[in-house]
Amino acid sequence: MEKTYNPTSIEQALYQTWEEKGYFKPHGDTTKESYSIMIPPPNVTGSLHMGHAFQDTIMDTLIRCERMKGKNTLWQVGTDHAGIATQMVVERKIAAEEGKTKHDYGRDAFIDKIWEWKGESGGTITKQLRRLGASVDWDRERFTMDDGLSNAVQEVFVRLYEDDLIYRGKRLVNWDPKLHTAISDLEVENKDTKGHMWHFRYPLADGVKTADGKDYIVVATTRPETMLGDTGVAVNPEDPRYKDLIGKEIILPIVDRRIPIVGDEHADMEKGTGCVKITPAHDFNDYEVGKRHQLPMINILTFDANIRGAAEVFNTNGEPSDAYSTELPAKYHGMERFAARKAIVAEFDELGLLEEVKDHDLQVPYGDRGGVVIEPMLTDQWYVRTAPLAKTAVEAVENGDIQFVPKQYENMYFSWMRDVQDWCISRQLWWGHRIPAWYDNQGNVYVGRTEEEVRKNNNLESVIELHQDEDVLDTWFSSALWTFGTQGWPEQTDDLKVFHPSDVLVTGFDIIFFWVARMIMMTMHFVKDENGKPQVPFKTVYVTGLIRDENGDKMSKSKGNVLDPIDMIDGIDLESLVEKRTGNMMQPQLAKKIEKNTRKTFENGIEAYGTDALRFTLAAMASTGRDINWDMKRLEGYRNFCNKLWNASRYVMMNTEEQDCGFNGGEIEYSLADKWIESQFELAAKAFNNHIDNFRLDMASNTLYEFIWNQFCDWYLELTKPVLWKGTEAQQRGTRRTLITVLEKTLRLAHPVIPYITETIWQSIKPLVEGVEGETIMLQALPQFDEANFNQEALDDIEWVKAFITSIRNLRAEYDINPGKPLDVMLKAANAEDAARLEANKQVLMSLAKLESVRVLAADEETPACATALVAKSELMIPMAGLIDKDAELARLDGEIKKTHGEIKRIEGKLGNEGFVAKAPEAVVAKEREKLEGYKETLAKLEEQKKTIAAL
């Protein structure tokens, strides 16, 4: 083994070996239990972020554990075509490099351009996944636009259409005027904005008056421009001010349209004026009111969100209607929506119909990708009827076929599924799965897998022109088929039988609706077991928290606080990190602030920590469902942990290589410490497996840390030294054998979390351990609890020995006794058991506690002035005469006491200041109180020590 642990020199070559040798593949023995995980497919455009690294570490740990249990494991890998995201990247690229738009290319050539770009850049994320040590089966890598998945997507669309679960309708959607596509509710970001509420007078028709004698009513709106499309005014049927006006009409200013006053609960008597303008084609609530009262829908906007030259008028079923004129005032034609808002307010003012304008706080919907205000738009879209599908999907969670970890996320899932809306699945993009529907020149629609099939099924002659729907399917439609589409469905393949349903889905809470729920609905509709029972896509949904920065803020490019996991593996200098965080920003004005913060937080850049340290940190922070504040100090701590394991392994090798480890005959005598470390290992193996089974990777990692650092390195290696130096041959054989076998088992136990370092060390020690065969640690058995190796008595005895040694070390520190000075120690034994323990472990105690002598006091023996400590129920005593300079020690203690008094006074003064307590953040005040308690405890200890020294 190399003298120092250098992850850079081992990781990439080792991964290449694993991949080339095919260790990641399922072993194919179907008599053994199978276990599968389908990776949430990252965007093909993307690169690995901390969230990926976190979830991939969790999945890899789980899959490596199950592989080591001998199961037939598959970790299915793949990437998502990511419709909008990918199209935007390529559109930006051709605009920047060639000054062209997608229309300059045309649909087919532009799609070719995207495939070309995917070929060049699409591999970034999979290369990075390899750097993390992800043991996925690369031979089965899938892409959501590959032939197999495209066939599955077509099949699902056609079957849903045939089952009357897909329909086409004119409905309101969230329209992104910049990207020119519908987007889902979940892609809309509502931003709090300071705006206005305009109060307009709408004149009543036919001489009608209000209860208080006015010939108009006042409506309040935040969107004046949409009044051009009003087809009604709603009042609450219980409102005494207006209930007599229900059924009457108003004359809509500017366009002179007669529209009815309807009674509807949507109008709130307490809010605004109590009268609400109804624009069914431009507001989701109004759309519902319009349907209830059969109000026509008038679309006044183009897809660019400009005022149309002529309106479109439809009835509530979305069919063209002549209920109203399509004319709109000429001066507004082609006007941008917010310019039209100003102009319409000005015209109302000129007409004397602007009652008042009030400041108003409102939420404005923005597209999370396009970044512009979203417009509710009446368009022809394809929809999935989700209610029938949702019923089965809810039952699967209710009856426990699918479990959420943590369980509280079930409630989030239920609340969404029980109020599920039909799912708009069409997108006005070019990149994606094109909708398998064709139209003739009369507007008839035909759905089928191919144009040939459509013609054949509908007896359409070749002279009848057909053109395919221009739209593509929502990206989430194809990713909803991920668990079964990747395994060969609609064919009934062996893979589908063996690996479906998958065992666990590891995902963030933010896509429970987008993806998890839709996967459950789609899978249960299309995949059935041999008894015809719907199959779930996975048995467990493990929901992780988000990784935030050290201050608890979400990591984002605009905040400049994103950490790249690869930078923590390889390291990055400060200038490159600044450039990475401030280059190519959407908001360049933030660059200076980001640079300043980066230079402050990472003065020397980021050093290389290696993959294992990163993985261990991520696993150790994986408390279920909680958000995680990233902490570079913990990463440093776990890199030190890897160093510790490396150095401990070198110690074991130095003491076992070319030595007699008792594998070739000869007498073997195991020490108490040997039996103890075996027992400690069994407890660690038991705890580790339990924690993994319960998805508590944080606790599993803590178990490894506690055992390797505290028990194996800090105690057991020290306890072996007296035996290796002075023990008999039989004792040395026992200790060497224990050293090498426990290390080998420990490497296997830790391998799922830290695969590189464990494989490297294991390859070095493998020849030294009897019965260990095989080319790689990853196909060895994961240790399980073995009762035969467990010895409770040895555990109890060594805990006593540890307490004895720790007490001596603490007393040396307390009384400032030189750590290397041999001491005479006595034990006032509380019972025969403690006396026997002292005798049995005398050699170890004298060696590790650096003692001149140690003995049990006789029952009636007088004792000189001693420093004392309790070990179990017995009293440990160190005679102090001659050990310390009494006067100097008292002077030192007086100095410490004075200093501590000063600190107490200072903090009490601070906390007594009402201004400080009132103004300082709660956390700061709490910290000061904590400090005060600490100083008070220190003072009590110092005064106790002074008393003891004074009595010498």
UniProtKB/Swiss-Prot annotation:
Annotated source species: Vibrio parahaemolyticus serotype O3:K6 (strain RIMD 2210633)
Q: What class of enzyme is it?
A: ligase
**Function, as annotated:** Catalyzes the attachment of valine to tRNA(Val). As ValRS can inadvertently accommodate and process structurally similar amino acids such as threonine, to avoid such errors, it has a 'posttransfer' editing activity that hydrolyzes mischarged Thr-tRNA(Val) in a tRNA-dependent manner.
Give the comment on domains: ValRS has two distinct active sites: one for aminoacylation and one for editing. The misactivated threonine is translocated from the active site to the editing site.
Give the location of motif 'KMSKS' region in residue numbers: 554-558
- According to its UniProt record, which protein family does this protein belong to? Belongs to the class-I aminoacyl-tRNA synthetase family. ValS type 1 subfamily.
* Motif 'HIGH' region mapped to chain: 42-52
Q: Which residues bind ATP?
A: 557
Subcellular location(s): the record lists:
Cytoplasm
Q: Which GO terms describe its cellular component?
A: cytosol
**Record field: catalytic activity:** tRNA(Val) + L-valine + ATP = L-valyl-tRNA(Val) + AMP + diphosphate
Supply the Pfam families for this chain.
Anticodon_1, tRNA-synt_1, Val_tRNA-synt_C
PANTHER family in the cross-refs: VALINE--TRNA LIGASE, CHLOROPLASTIC_MITOCHONDRIAL 2 (PTHR11946:SF93), VALYL-TRNA SYNTHETASES (PTHR11946)
Q: Which residues form a coiled coil?
A: 888-952
What broad class describes the main subcellular location of this protein? cytoplasm
Q: Which gene encodes it?
A: valS
Which GO biological process entries does UniProt record here? valyl-tRNA aminoacylation
Keyword NAD attached: no
Q: What is its EC number?
A: 6.1.1.9
**Protein name as annotated:** Valine--tRNA ligase
A GO molecular function held by the record: ATP binding
Alphabetized, the UniProt keywords read: Aminoacyl-tRNA synthetase, ATP-binding, Coiled coil, Cytoplasm, Ligase, Nucleotide-binding, Protein biosynthesis
Highest rank taxon of the organism = Bacteria
